[in-house]
């Protein structure tokens, strides 16, 4: 490097430099031993001899360098001493050395900028070398040390003299102009950066070795830190061709800047005095955070998912986030943001760092305000960069793009190091997404503007931009060149990578498969309803690539990609779209195939197995792909997505025909994975999800009678369904879940538990009423039951506690249900014995205890081992169909008598003995020798439902309800002896309560009462009698912890869980006998009925008696009854779009009725007020008639006069002339517009006073004239059809010569604006009167699909009485294309007075009727304070006012003296969001207009 310096120095013409170069080259960059002393000696001699000549030369050189090179000031280094090894080390003090040494103090006047070495030849290079060698000489070298201070002082003085002479030189003007774009000198910038990063600098003398190795090491280190690795000898002093190389040498050793700053201290001060800028830079500029926090914030901004949506003002941007609702306005200059998070928020830093591309160390980044020239400079650079990308790309750019597309992973490492600065900058720009302002990597999903600038963008960023365009109702355009995007489908130009699919989106969207025209066409037709394009293309995980291929073929890449989105909203929308597409495809396929195949197998899913047409094949493939999708999406953890998946499942099933057995088999096979997924969801931790899953499968069990009936929505489908209960049972039992997969087991067990309760007729035929037809033999039904119990028996020993306990509970509760069929009960005991379970002994004890309860223990012990089939007849005989009014004791006696001929006298045994024995069984007391057991639980709280299953038949429910003998008068009598026996005793387990027991009659009364309470929609006569041996209620919520008390009102919901099913009344008895009977909760409760509910206070007194039993009862209650109003069913969540849950709480109903009445009353009052307003609107004064302006029906309202040229066809020819100054006279001017004038006029023939609006239609070009004529005709014809008391009326219109004359009725009171200027602000009563009339007129216009768009005081006319207001001047009015309020066809048109215009109009967004409502609020402000809103009279610059309103975050200030009512009206009108403003018709219902002022 030093050799190169020597060569370059010798070419400059200095002999000393040429003489020094050989030593420099031979030394290889290392100083010789005597180099430093020799340089110091030469420096001392030259200082005394040739000072004046050198000073003159320095001044000339300084002028030259500064005048030419100060444009490099932002890149100039802090100190020049960071050069590489000094090239000049001559052993003898030659004149060249001396000259170099004397000039070594040149930096005292100011450091040469980078590039000075190349322009000044070797002299400046040796200056630095000699200066370094002299400055760093050892302490022992006295002559150089003594000479150094004197030389510096001399240089300082002479430099100052030269600087004073530069003040009036023309170079100074150039320097100032060069400094306009700079804000802070680079030395100060670097100094601040180093100070923040390294803290205070401690200056220490650095001893330099005699051989100069310290300086060599320093230079080498500096060189190593540089970004450009070229072989230049002085990276700090050369002029680099790359802009990135100038800051590369600004970092050196931590201690070196301190030393140099001390020795060359005049540098910053002198440089500051050389070129004082004409405009000082903005103040501050220091980061308010610590260096670490500053770095963290900058890094956060560089990674933030923010997007530049558009520039919405001269100095403002609209910044968006991933969510379409997150938009923020960033204002440059004031440096603030609409997010309200204070200065230097992430959005402002995003604009500064990524939009303006400032360096993180740029002081402008941390300024709280920027001056105008700084803002202009930033925007100028931004727009120049942006416009450079819009220009047509060069051939080289296109070739590079093509090469990158074809070979993305073969980037050469050397290709980035050999490019010029301009090409590198442009290449960097091309590799940056213009929306997120981040680089585009090869592995990212990219798209390209194909019809415009051909710039690449991120797919995700483009989807954000597409959503913005969609919300603004704009066509999708390129955010750079504004050219129209080819399609709403974003074509994937992503480069091939292991993650991406090789098939592009465009290829997928083409109808390459026979399924595409069916599903794809439906999807495209309904794109407006279920538009997914604005979500962009979502990446499909690699694990699902192969699985998703048939999905893509059937439904398209766009929809399938959204199913894998990380945003649950996108997934939900995709499922809604999928539901729509599939139902449409199935309808289309079914409709076309039924005509060809004749119905038998037409439209089937068997892919042509039953029919040879292609249409069934299409629908079959769609269903197959659809079921595959559902098997995955039904596992979604988000509840709303899961609901959407079930809705999609229903949509598919109800439109899928199934006529043959083959079709049923195929449909069963396709649905099997879906059902398996839902089975797992039955044990979901989310209670709503588990309830909904169980309810869904119950609907499937109902077959063609349920909500999931196959082909339900197809007319005359005649589908046979998928099999109902049998199919669900096959799904439960078919795939035997592994024992380690506890979720699958628990989900199946939860469903089994619910099935046995909800559709008990399928499993317990002995308790079904005789009038219920039995489709299947009893044997088959019992086999179903046994298969389920065998499945539960397999899981009794499961390691997962919840699985094992629920299995045991199901088994025991089913055993209790079949006690009336002793052979079946015996079969259960046998199955338990054969299982070899570790719980065998305990389970058998509990089974025998159940047998003892119902007095069939002897039957079991006598060896009733007959097979189930052999005992069916006796089983039927043992189970009478119904016992509507028999007590539990009587029924037990009946079973005993008819079953095995047991003695009826057995009933006379002491009830105390039975109660004591079975209470111990039920409670599981430690003192009970027969029922000793731990405290297992099915729920997480650790309490088993099974502990409640074995309640004593005689354990009195009266324990909880002591006063229930009176209410029930319809209960039949029972034997007195039974009553006496039961009433004498109480179970030993409940002695501390001291509450007398209840009689069986009382028990039965309570049971019947409770039955009426719980059975909302059931016919109690069809239900079985109240069994004392009862199974527990369902446990769909078995997996989650419950509240410690029953929820008030929960009993009234009991029937909901078992609606439309053969729910046994023993369910009620299980609550009565087991839950309340076994000494459970409270001794002070009342009978549950429709008017009463359980409260925590009622069961509190029994809590400490037996917490085990209390907990079990509580679990039974909560498992059997919905604990609150949030019960989730398939019908409430899926089948009905807007579910209305039946409420049985009378208090709630009363509240609802009361509120409903209040609401109805208020609505009636509003409607009455509106009727009055409309009635007042109907009162219309007579309009004077001018004969010459009348036209026949069907003729054009515009009458063309005779002397008018025939250039305007379509008008009515005048039968009678009506010319100015002849038939009518023009009076004083009352208004003036750009192309129109308004005058008072009088009809000569009738004397009618009129106002005439004369509009000239002549323009410079014919096309412009045609537009004007068409607009005038539209205005005239519009006004001719308007007839309302608050709308100005037109008498007629003529076309005469070059003018259109619009004759309108005369309003003598002039305009509201004129009255305000003449009389001042109105009183509030007047404001309310005028506002109401204004709203009436606007309501009439809006109902006729007209928006005025120019509502202001100048266009509101008052009649001669001052009481009637009419809306005038429809020059800006336009007719809406539809009757929808949100029509937005007038985007970008700035019509009307600015101060009264809505922000969305000024922003160029879509607008509709709501813009007139905003103007009403502005008119209220104008009438209340006689000034337009926004202090518009103080704004002489219309653009500034537009910007103020368009960027406003609050409504204009409302006068404080307004009453609350009128203030509320104004605030409603001035809602910033158009959709939040009420329609004018709704505002008329406001109470302020119903009050007499």
Curated annotation (Swiss-Prot):
> What cofactor does this one take?
Mg(2+)
Zinc-finger ranges (RING-type): 433-482
Domain (Protein kinase) spans: 1224-1489
Where mainly located? Answer: membrane
Identify its membrane topology class.
Answer: Peripheral membrane protein
Q: In which residue ranges is the amino acid composition biased (Low complexity)?
A: 1-23, 33-42, 95-108, 135-151, 230-257, 507-522
**Biased composition, Pro residues: where in the chain?**
84-94
Q: Any idea which UniProt keywords this protein has?
A: Acetylation, ATP-binding, Kinase, Magnesium, Membrane, Metal-binding, Nucleotide-binding, Phosphoprotein, Serine/threonine-protein kinase, Transferase, Zinc, Zinc-finger
ZnF locations on chain (SWIM-type): 328-356
**Keyword Transit peptide belongs to the record:** no
What are its GO biological-process terms?
apoptotic mitochondrial changes; camera-type eye development; cellular response to mechanical stimulus; epithelial cell morphogenesis; eyelid development in camera-type eye; JNK cascade; MAPK cascade; morphogenesis of an epithelial sheet
- The first-level EC class reads transferase
List every position bearing Phosphothreonine.
275, 1381, 1393
Q: Which family does it belong to?
A: Belongs to the protein kinase superfamily. STE Ser/Thr protein kinase family. MAP kinase kinase kinase subfamily.
Q: Do you know which PANTHER family this protein is assigned to?
A: MITOGEN-ACTIVATED PROTEIN KINASE KINASE KINASE 19-RELATED (PTHR11584:SF369), SERINE/THREONINE PROTEIN KINASE (PTHR11584)
Protein name, per record: Mitogen-activated protein kinase kinase kinase 1
């Amino acid at each position: 490097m030093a050799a190169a310096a020597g060569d370059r120095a010798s070419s400059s013409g200095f002999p000393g430099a040429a003489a020094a170069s050989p030593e420099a080259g031979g030394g290889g960059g290392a100083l010789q031993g005597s180099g430093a002393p020799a340089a110091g000696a030469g420096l001392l001699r030259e200082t005394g001899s040739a000072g004046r000549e050198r000073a003159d030369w320095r001044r000339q050189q300084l002028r030259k360098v500064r005048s030419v090179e100060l444009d490099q000031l932002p890149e100039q280094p802090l100190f020049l001493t960071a050069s590489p090894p000094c090239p000049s080390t001559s052993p003898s003090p030659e004149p060249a050395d001396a000259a170099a040494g004397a000039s070594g103090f040149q930096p005292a006047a100011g450091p040469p900028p980078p590039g000075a070495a190349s322009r000044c030849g070797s002299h400046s290079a040796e200056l630095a070398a000699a200066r370094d060698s002299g400055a760093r000489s050892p302490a022992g070298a006295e002559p150089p040390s003594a000479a150094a201070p004197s030389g510096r002082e001399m240089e300082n003085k002479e430099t100052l003299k030269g600087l004073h002479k530069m003040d009036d030189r023309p170079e100074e003007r150039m320097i100032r102009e060069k400094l306009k774009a700079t804000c802070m000198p680079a030395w100060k910038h670097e100094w601040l950066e180093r100070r923040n990063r390294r803290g205070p600098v401690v200056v220490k003398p650095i001893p330099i070795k005699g051989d100069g190795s310290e300086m060599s090491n320093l230079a080498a280190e500096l060189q190593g830190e540089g970004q450009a690795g070229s072989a230049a000898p002085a990276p700090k002093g050369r002029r680099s061709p790359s802009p990135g190389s100038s800051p590369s040498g600004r970092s050196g050793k931590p201690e070196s800047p301190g030393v140099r700053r001390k020795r060359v201290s005049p540098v910053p001060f002198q440089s500051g005095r050389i070129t004082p800028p004409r405009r000082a830079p903005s103040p501050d500029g220091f980061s308010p955070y610590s260096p670490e926090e500053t770095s963290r914030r900058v890094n956060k901004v560089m990674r933030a998912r923010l997007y530049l949506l558009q520039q919405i003002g001269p100095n403002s941007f609209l910044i968006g986030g991933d969510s379409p609702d997150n938009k923020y306005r960033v204002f440059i200059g004031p440096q603030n943001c609409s997010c309200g998070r204070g200065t230097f928020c992430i959005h402002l830093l995003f604009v500064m760092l990524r939009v303006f591309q400032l360096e993180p160390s740029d002081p402008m980044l941390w300024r709280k305000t920027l001056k105008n020239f700084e803002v202009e400079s930033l925007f100028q650079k931004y727009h120049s960069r942006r416009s450079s990308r819009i220009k047509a790309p060069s051939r080289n750019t296109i070739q590079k793009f093509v090469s990158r597309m074809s070979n993305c992973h073969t980037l050469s490492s050397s290709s980035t190091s050999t490019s010029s600065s301009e090409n590198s900058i442009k290449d960097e720009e091309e590799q940056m997404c213009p929306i997120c302002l981040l680089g585009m990597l090869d592995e990212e999903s990219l798209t390209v503007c194909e019809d415009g600038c051909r710039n690449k963008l991120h797919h995700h960023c483009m989807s954000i931009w597409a959503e913005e365009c969609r919300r603004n109702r704009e066509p999708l355009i390129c955010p750079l060149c504004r050219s129209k995007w080819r399609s709403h489908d974003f074509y994937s130009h992503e480069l091939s990578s292991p993650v991406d699919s090789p098939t592009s989106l465009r290829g997928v969207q083409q109808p390459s498969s026979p399924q595409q025209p069916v599903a794809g066409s439906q999807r495209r037709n309904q794109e407006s309803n279920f538009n997914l394009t604005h979500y962009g293309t979502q990446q499909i995980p690699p694990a699902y690539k192969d699985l998703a291929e048939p999905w893509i073929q059937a439904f398209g890449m766009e929809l399938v990609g959204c199913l894998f989105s990380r945003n649950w909203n996108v997934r939900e929308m995709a499922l809604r779209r999928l539901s729509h597409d599939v139902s449409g495809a199935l309808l289309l396929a079914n409709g076309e195939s039924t005509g060809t195949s004749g119905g038998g197998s037409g439209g089937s899913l068997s892919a042509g197995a039953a029919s040879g047409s292609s249409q069934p094949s299409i629908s079959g493939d769609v269903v197959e792909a659809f079921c595959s999708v559902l098997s995955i999406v039904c596992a979604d953890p988000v509840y709303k997505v899961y609901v959407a998946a079930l809705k999609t499942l229903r949509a598919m099933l109800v439109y899928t025909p199934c006529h043959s057995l083959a079709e049923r088999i195929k449909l069963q096979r396709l649905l099997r994975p879906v059902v398996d997924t839902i089975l797992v969801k039955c044990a979901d931790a989310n209670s709503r999800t588990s309830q909904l899953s169980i309810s869904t499968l119950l609907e499937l069990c109902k077959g063609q009678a349920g909500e999931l009936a196959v082909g339900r929505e197809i007319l005359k489908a005649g589908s046979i369904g998928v099999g109902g209960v049998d199919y669900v049972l096959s799904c439960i039992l078919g795939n035997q879940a592994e024992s380690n997969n506890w979720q699958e087991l628990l989900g199946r067990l939860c469903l089994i538990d619910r099935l046995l309760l909800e559709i008990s007729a399928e499993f317990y035929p002995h308790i079904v009423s005789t009038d219920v037809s039995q489709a299947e033999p009893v044997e088959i039904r019992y086999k179903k039951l046994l298969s389920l119990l065998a499945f539960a028996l397999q899981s009794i020993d499961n390691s997962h506690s919840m699985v094992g306990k629920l299995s045991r509970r199901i088994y025991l509760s089913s055993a209790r249900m079949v006690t009336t069929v002793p052979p079946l009960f015996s079969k259960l005991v046998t199955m338990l014995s054969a299982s070899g379970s570790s719980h065998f002994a305990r389970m058998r004890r509990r089974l025998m205890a159940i047998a003892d309860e119902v007095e069939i223990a002897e039957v079991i012990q006598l060896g009733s081992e007959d097979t189930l089939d052999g005992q069916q007849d006796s089983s039927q005989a043992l189970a009478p169909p119904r016992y509507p009014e028999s007590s539990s004791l009587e029924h037990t006696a009946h079973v005993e008598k008819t079953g095995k001929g047991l003695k009826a006298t057995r009933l006379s045994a002491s009830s105390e003995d039975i109660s004591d024995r079975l209470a111990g069984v039920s409670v599981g007391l430690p003192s009970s020798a027969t029922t000793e057991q731990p405290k297992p639980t099915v729920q997480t709280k650790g309490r088993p439902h099974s502990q409640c299953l074995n309640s004593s038949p005689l354990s009195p429910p009266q324990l909880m309800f002591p006063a229930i003998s009176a209410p029930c008068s319809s209960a039949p009598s029972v034997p007195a002896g039974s009553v006496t026996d039961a009433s004498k005793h109480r179970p030993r387990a409940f002695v501390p309560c001291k509450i007398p027991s209840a009689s069986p009659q009382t028990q039965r009364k309570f049971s019947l009462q409770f039955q009426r309470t719980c059975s909302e929609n059931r016919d109690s006569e069809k239900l079985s009698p109240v069994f004392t041996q009862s199974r527990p209620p369902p446990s769909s919520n078995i997996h989650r912890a419950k509240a410690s008390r029953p929820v008030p009102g929960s009993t009234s919901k009991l029937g909901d869980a078992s609606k439309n099913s053969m729910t046994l009344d023993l369910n009620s008895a299980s609550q009565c006998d087991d839950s309340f009977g076994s000494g459970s909760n409270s001794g002070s409760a009342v009978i549950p009925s429709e008017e009463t509910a359980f409260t925590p206070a009622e069961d509190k007194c029994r809590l400490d008696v037996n917490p085990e039993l209390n907990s079990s009862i509580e679990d039974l209650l909560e498992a059997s009854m919905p604990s609150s109003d949030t019960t989730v069913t398939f019908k409430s969540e899926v089948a009905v779009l807007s579910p209305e849950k039946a409420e049985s709480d009378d208090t709630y109903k009363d509240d609802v009725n009361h509120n409903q009445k209040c609401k109805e009353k208020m609505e009636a009052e509003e409607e009455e007020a509106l009727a009055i307003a409309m009635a007042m609107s109907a009162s219309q004064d007579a309009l004077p008639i001018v004969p010459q302006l009348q036209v026949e029906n069907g003729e054009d309202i515009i009458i063309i006069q005779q002397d008018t040229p025939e250039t305007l066809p379509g008008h009515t020819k005048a039968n009678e002339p009506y010319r100015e100054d002849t038939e009518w006279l023009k009076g004083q001017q009352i208004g003036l517009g750009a192309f129109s004038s308004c005058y008072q006029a009088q009809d000569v023939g009738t004397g009618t006073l009129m106002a005439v609006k004369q509009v000239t239609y002549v323009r410079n070009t014919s096309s412009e004239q045609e537009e004007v004529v068409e607009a005038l005709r539209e205005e005239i014809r519009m006004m001719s059809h308007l007839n309302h008391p608050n709308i100005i009326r037109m008498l007629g219109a003529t076309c005469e010569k070059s003018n259109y004359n619009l004759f309108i009725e005369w309003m003598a009171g002039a305009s509201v604006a004129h009255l305000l200027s003449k009389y001042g602000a109105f009183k509030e009563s007047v404001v309310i009167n005028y506002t109401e009339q204004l709203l009436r007129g606007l309501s009439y216009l809006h109902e006729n699909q007209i928006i005025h768009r120019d509502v202001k005081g100048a266009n509101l006319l008052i009649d001669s009485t001052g009481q009637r207001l009419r809306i005038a001047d429809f020059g800006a009015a336009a007719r809406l294309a539809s009757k929808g309020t949100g029509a937005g066809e007038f985007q970008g048109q700035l019509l009307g007075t600015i101060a009264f215009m809505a922000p969305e109009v000024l922003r160029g967004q879509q607008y509709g009727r709501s813009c007139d409502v905003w103007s009403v609020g502005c008119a209220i402000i104008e009438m209340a304070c006689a000034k337009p809103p926004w202090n518009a009279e103080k704004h002489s610059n219309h653009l500034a006012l537009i910007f103020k309103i368009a960027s406003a975050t609050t409504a204009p200030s409302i006068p404080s003296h307004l009453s609350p009512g009128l203030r509320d009206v104004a605030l409603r009108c001035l809602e910033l969001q158009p959709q939040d403003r009420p329609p004018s018709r709704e505002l008329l219902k406001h109470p302020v207009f119903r009050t007499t002022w």
